Amino acid sequence: MKKIKEAEQRKIRRKKRIKDKIGRGIATRPRITIFKSNRYFYAQVIDDSKGHTVASISTIEKSLNLSKNIDDIKKLGEVLAKRLKEKNINNLIFDRNGYKYHGLIASFATSLREFGINI
């Protein structure tokens, strides 16, 4: 039980440290935030000045029919990059939401970069 609490505390500290560094998203450079559940992967692009979600994507979308593995997360990044290009958004602030930058998070970010989104 103690190890679980310590892991949660570390995640909370990482999350606070990240928020302090990246600041808030604006209309010209919105913030992309990530959430991972045990089954699904979610990403949403947020304009913090208005408090609106500009674009979002997840593995739960039936039209995409994707699972939570690295290959499908790369496809998810590709689809989100296309959606952002349609809305003329090329620059983002990447908020990894306290998750370590490896595995799914890293592959999602590199996928966005490969398709022309500056993070």
Swiss-Prot record:
PANTHER family hit by this protein: 39S RIBOSOMAL PROTEIN L18, MITOCHONDRIAL, LARGE RIBOSOMAL SUBUNIT PROTEIN UL18M
tRNA processing listed as a keyword: no
Record key words, sorted: Ribonucleoprotein, Ribosomal protein, RNA-binding, rRNA-binding
Organism of origin: Borreliella afzelii (strain PKo)
Domain of life: Bacteria
One example of a Gene Ontology biological process annotation: translation
InterPro entries given in the database record: Ribosomal_uL18_bac-type, Ribosomal_uL18_bac/euk
Lineage: Bacteria, Pseudomonadati, Spirochaetota, Spirochaetia, Spirochaetales
GO CC annotations, alphabetized: cytosolic large ribosomal subunit
Oligomer and partners: Part of the 50S ribosomal subunit; part of the 5S rRNA/L5/L18/L25 subcomplex. Contacts the 5S and 23S rRNAs.
Family: Belongs to the universal ribosomal protein uL18 family.
Function: This is one of the proteins that bind and probably mediate the attachment of the 5S RNA into the large ribosomal subunit, where it forms part of the central protuberance.
Gene3D superfamilies registered for this protein in UniProt: 3.30.420.100
GO molecular function terms noted in the UniProt entry: 5S rRNA binding; structural constituent of ribosome
Name of the featured protein: Large ribosomal subunit protein uL18
Keyword Hydrolase: no
